[in-house]
Amino acid sequence: MVHGEAFSRPLSRNEVVGLIFRLTIFGAVTYFTIKWMVDAIDPTRKQKVEAQKQAEKLMRQIGVKNVKLTEYEMSIAAHLVDPLSMLVTWSDIAGLDDVITDLKDTVILPIRKRYLFENSRLLQPPKGVLLYGPPGCGKTMIAKATAKEAGCRFINLQPSTLTDKWYGESQKLAAAVFSLAVKLQPSIIFIDEIDSFLRSRSSSDHEATAMMKAQFMSLWDGLDTDFNCQVIVMGATNRPQDLDTAIMRRMPTRFHINQPSLKQREAILDLILRNESVDSHVDLMEIARGSDGFSGSDLKEMCRDAALLCVRDSVNNSSEESPCEEIRPIHQQDLLRAIDKMKRSKSATNQNVLMHVSLD
């Protein structure tokens, strides 16, 4: 009877406050416990939250409004590149005039002048473009300049973005790549070193990897069935022979970005040294002849070494009484010394590669 009366009597004010306090403590402990367990189960949760914030920031920068994105699309959107923030233009690329002209005709013109081509299926921009050739010859620069010139949203897709330890998540991320690109079209999905991601399939491939590749190619095929879709998959590789034949079929437009010829090297050197302090007696044609086999990246590094020689000489010839006030111009001899250094470096690298090959 006493117990019944205790339950039936109203709670005092202190008891109510105490009960609310205990419930609050219990709720807070439960919340943080669950949050800790979720974070422990998914260690990438923090990175996903940061990626979402980055994606929202990029979406605002490129002027995309009122577009709802899924969680997976947000993860991909973190790799968006604002075309206005790209500093690469056609004027930054020398010696590839033929490639640039073909790209303008086959890719850029159908996007920028869409109204001229909308009634023809043959004149639509290709759904796959492959840039292949030796390293350091400007493939990535060409892709960025193409996106900027065409006014496309640029998704710089990293293969690691599509890998997830949870079963089925990689396929969802692959689907998000294309659904996001369609929402933001015109857009370019750029995959650098595409051979590392979509290499020839074999029976030794992991099941999840094989399923993700199949999903990616299936969604890629979907672009061809949509007549008005303006999404282009652009890949760059220096090992086209490693690409899956099914991928090659989906990239019918191909551009070979080869090692620069003599005239191309001269044009590249002129571009690199255009805004630098260079002696008027420098003969770029002679430098171009001496740099046979150099890529565009090699030529830039060679010119940097020549400029550093000028800095070193200016600093060494200065003293406390007469400090260095300006750096002397780049001379012909500086460039020739830089060529010798680059050749020794390339020769040593090739020897190391051969040693590793022979050991294997």
Swiss-Prot record:
It catalyses: [protein]-with a C-terminal TM segment(out) + ATP + H2O = [protein]-with a C-terminal TM segment(in) + ADP + phosphate + H(+). Keywords: ATP-binding, Cell membrane, Membrane, Mitochondrion, Mitochondrion outer membrane, Nucleotide-binding, Peroxisome, Postsynaptic cell membrane, Synapse, Translocase, Transmembrane, Transmembrane helix. GO terms for molecular function: ATP binding; ATP hydrolysis activity; membrane protein dislocase activity. It is a single-pass membrane protein. Residues 35-360 are cytoplasmic. Gene3D superfamilies: 1.10.8.60, P-loop containing nucleotide triphosphate hydrolases. InterPro entries: AAA+_ATPase (IPR003593), AAA_lid_3 (IPR041569), ATPase_AAA_core (IPR003959), ATPase_AAA_CS (IPR003960), Mito_OM_Translocase_MSP1 (IPR051701), P-loop_NTPase (IPR027417). It is found in: Mitochondrion outer membrane; Peroxisome membrane; Postsynaptic cell membrane. GO terms for biological process: extraction of mislocalized protein from mitochondrial outer membrane. ATP binds at residues 133-140. Its EC number is 7.4.2.-. Residues 1-15 are mitochondrial intermembrane. GO terms for cellular component: mitochondrial outer membrane; peroxisomal membrane; postsynaptic membrane. The chain crosses the membrane at residues 16-34. Outer mitochondrial translocase required to remove mislocalized tail-anchored transmembrane proteins on mitochondria. Specifically recognizes and binds tail-anchored transmembrane proteins: acts as a dislocase that mediates the ATP-dependent extraction of mistargeted tail-anchored transmembrane proteins from the mitochondrion outer membrane. Also plays a critical role in regulating the surface expression of AMPA receptors (AMPAR), thereby regulating synaptic plasticity and learning and memory. Belongs to the AAA ATPase family. MSP1 subfamily. PANTHER family: AAA ATPASE, PUTATIVE (AFU_ORTHOLOGUE AFUA_2G12920)-RELATED-RELATED (PTHR45644), OUTER MITOCHONDRIAL TRANSMEMBRANE HELIX TRANSLOCASE (PTHR45644:SF2). This is Outer mitochondrial transmembrane helix translocase.
